[in-house]
Amino acid sequence: MKKTFLLCSFLFFGTTLVNAQDIKDVYFEYMTLRMDGDKKNETISIAQTLLNRSTELNEKQLANVNFHLARVYADTGSPEKAIAHYEASLKYEPNYYVTHNALGFLHLKKCDSLGKAVTASAKLKDVALNQKTFKAYKLEVDKTIPYFEKSQACDPDEVTMNILTGLYKSTKNTEGLATLPVRLEALKGNCVTLLDDE
């Protein structure tokens, strides 16, 4: 009981102290912590503190904090929180292709899960269920494709192209696949390769 009280007191006063610090000092501490893979919980805590003081940060810093917080959430098995923070990062820096790539892979996991449901419903020969599961699958694929397209336009690789091709084919979107090169060409003109915070 005493240990719990002491821990709660430490966390409360520690949080109060961080909130009283100059924002530059808190941001520097965050930058240091996020480099240490063994301090994920501390990184989450200080990143949330920074986001609570978002009016004191510039847009580049907000993009950076959200991006790295999303990465920590993805690494610690919280994909929904990761998606939310990657999307928040895109609001501040919409052309950073690494964020698009990360979101693409998080959504791809959902596509894979929904794709299995489509396959299972087809095996059951349940037409209504198959239509329902395919509709949900297609919605998720349609969310996923733009992230991979931006990533592929900015940093082309065979794996991403194969994923895109597979997603288009799995939803029988031949027109989307045929016009993919045109979209990639248009998207590659605006790529951010480094998430700067200054």
PLM regions and their residue ranges:
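Short coil/turn linking the two alpha-helices of tandem helical-hairpin repeats
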Residues: 37, 71-77, 104, 109-119, ...
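Residue-level recognition of tetratricopeptide repeat
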Residues: 62, 96, 157-158, 191
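TPR alpha-solenoid repeat register
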Residues: 65, 99, 160-161
